[in-house]
Design a protein with these regions (language model features):
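N-terminal cationic and glycine-rich segments that engage phosphates or anionic surfaces
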Residues: 1-101, 105-437
């Protein structure tokens, strides 16, 4: 690993890309310290500390602490991620967008521009809701039009700036810029989470107990990382044979190919969707100062991951069951709109391709559907295990950490993808890469 990094820095182009990326990440961390003008950050921090559960903890984790500090980067790149998902879904529903996506480089540029506009619109909506909510709850120094407009402008500009930084990293740096921005924010909270764990389970304990706690903590982390790597890189390859045919005086075709089906075909999307649906009511109620009464108060607690897996309050773990069901549902739903077995089977038939032992056309489509349903189920189970383990330890053992399965999946997938990109650039220049170390 160290030799590979050393070789990478020997190559001027790669060195410049790495240094540019690191420079942009430093700028982001500095920006996370700049408070939103007009917001009483001290009072807001006190309110945040009183919030129970994972809704705000997760949101703060992916913003790298910017939400807790109520900095100008508090919205993070969440509007951009939401915008990208919306555009991906609309591309399937709206033929014009689908045609634009297939229209080469020009179409891609138009899609990127539309995604930017949708991002700004979503950032405006979110920042407006936050600014007005802050004013009503007394988190603004003074609730007036100037402070509200200032907060809206600062939060929207911060989100737009992060989008711009992400695009610049993609263009001039290493890896996918948006993903790297998200990862650096998550990683910035790891020292605090590890400190909390050690303070709670290691420091002040008997030596034997402390050593056992350290071993268990790192064993769980390593096991989760290994599982995420398997989910990220696991692939089921469906063999495809192409029939031979005469073209002029030559016999062409007869090649063997495959259709790679990833174990985790939907990535982290099912978890993000499930969390968004369950945490949205909690966040809205918190901002407007409504804690609920009667049945509604119990429902809010059930939706709050901070109450899950608590032995003294098992009824609220029904919310965890709903969370699991939503993950499975969105795993199948998202895969169904991004992978079309019928279209693949039709294209294979037109090109003279077939799966050995399976007739072309509908039988091929049915076979792909059957395999895909099995793979999606396995992937969903993996996602559930990775995402539920942190909730289990938080509830049963009171481990107060914001770092969860979603964060781990994002970090591992982005790190692996970035390593592969550096690897490919190293191999072009005849250097060994990470995968050969």
């Amino acid at each position: 690993m160290l030799t590979t990094l050393k070789n990478a820095f020997k190559i001027k182009e790669i060195r410049q890309k790495i240094l540019f990326t690191l420079g942009m990440l430093v700028v982001i961390r500095i920006g996370s310290l700049l408070p939103v003008p007009g917001v009483d950050t001290k009072f807001f921090s006190q309110w945040f500390a009183q919030q129970t559960g994972g809704a705000f903890s997760f949101f703060d984790a992916i913003t790298g602490g910017s939400f807790l500090n109520m900095s100008i980067l508090a919205l993070n790149i969440n509007p951009y991620i939401t915008s990208s998902i919306i555009m991906q879904l609309l591309t399937i529903a709206i033929p014009k967008l689908e045609e634009m996506q297939r229209d080469g480089e020009d179409g891609r540029k138009k899609m990127v521009a539309i995604t930017r506009y949708v991002t700004i619109a979503l950032a405006l909506i979110q920042s407006t809701a936050m600014a007005i909510g802050f004013g009503r709850q007394g988190y603004l120094i003074e609730f007036n039009a100037l402070n509200v407009i200032t907060a809206i402008t600062a939060l929207t500009a911060g989100s737009a700036f992060l989008m711009w930084v992400g695009e610049r990293i993609t263009e001039k740096g290493i890896g996918n810029g948006i993903s790297i921005v998200l990862v650096i924010n998550i990683i910035s909270r790891l020292p605090q989470d590890l400190s909390n764990l050690f303070e709670q389970f290691v420091f002040g304990k008997a030596p034997a107990t402390a050593i056992l706690a350290v071993v268990i903590i790192f064993a769980i982390i390593i096991a989760m990382v290994v599982l995420v790597i398997i989910l990220n890189d696991g692939v089921r390859k469906i063999p495809v044979q192409y029939a031979k045919k005469m073209q002029g005086r030559k016999m062409v075709g007869g090649q063997t190919s495959n259709i790679p089906l990833k174990v985790n075909t939907s990535g982290v999307i099912p978890i993000i969707f499930a969390q968004s649906i369950m945490q949205f009511p909690i966040i809205i109620c918190s901002f407007i100062g409504y804690n609920g009464t009667g049945v509604w108060a119990e429902i809010l607690k059930g939706l709050n991951s901070g109450y899950w897996c608590k032995p003294s309050q098992p009824i609220y773990s029904l919310g965890l069951l709903l969370y699991i069901v939503l993950i499975v549902f969105f795993a199948y739903f998202y895969t169904s709109i991004t992978f079309n077995p019928l279209m693949i089977a039709d294209n294979m038939k037109k090109q003279g391709g077939f799966i050995p032992g399976i007739r072309p056309g509908k039988p091929t489509s049915d076979y792909l559907n059957k395999i895909l349903n099995y793979i999606v189920f396995i992937g969903a189970i993996g996602l559930i295990i990775v995402s539920v383990i942190p909730y289990f330890f938080n509830g049963v053992f009171g481990a107060s950490v914001s770092f969860g399965g979603t964060s781990l999946i994002i970090i591992v997938s982005v790190v692996l993808e970035t390593m592969k990109q550096v690897e490919s650039q190293m191999l072009v220049r005849n250097y060994k890469g990470f995968l050969e170390d």
